[in-house]
């Protein structure tokens, strides 16, 4: 174990590749709301985002340099979970779309 508590070549600053697959999603944040397609149902669930909703750490004005390593890791994990949720929602919507157009 290294002095950081992580085994060598592991941890937040590891040179190893992440165990998460790369994402090909491009994130855009339009200033206007798009009208929802009725073919996809009427309900829309906005994902909670640490960037938009809940700040990481106790201080809402905390910059990343003021957050502890553990807090940053928690934030990264939260973002990864949100990405996974959204990807699952996209897959479900694609399946619904295939059913509707077949």
UniProtKB/Swiss-Prot annotation:
Pfam families: GPS2_interact (PF15784). It comes from the Eukaryota. InterPro entries: N-CoR_corepressor, N-CoR_GPS2_interact. Residues 1-68 are annotated as: Disordered. Transmembrane segments: none annotated. Keywords: Coiled coil. Residues 1-18 have a biased composition (Polar residues). Residues 68-100 form a coiled coil. PANTHER family: NUCLEAR RECEPTOR CO-REPRESSOR RELATED NCOR (PTHR13992), NUCLEAR RECEPTOR COREPRESSOR 1 (PTHR13992:SF5). Belongs to the N-CoR nuclear receptor corepressors family. This is Putative nuclear receptor corepressor 1-like protein NCOR1P1. It comes from Homo sapiens. The lineage of its organism: Eukaryota, Metazoa, Chordata, Craniata, Vertebrata. The gene is NCOR1P1.
């Amino acid at each position: 174990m290294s002095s950081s508590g992580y085994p060598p070549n592991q941890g937040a600053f590891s040179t190893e590749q992440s165990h998460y697959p790369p994402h090909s999603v491009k994130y855009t944040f339009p200033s206007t709301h798009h009208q929802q397609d009725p073919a996809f149902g009427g309900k829309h669930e906005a994902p909670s985002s640490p960037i938009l909703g809940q700040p990481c750490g106790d201080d809402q004005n905390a910059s990343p340099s003021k957050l502890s390593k553990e807090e940053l890791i928690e934030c990264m994990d939260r973002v990864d979970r949100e990405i996974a949720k959204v990807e699952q929602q996209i897959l479900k919507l694609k399946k619904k779309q295939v059913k509707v157009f077949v």
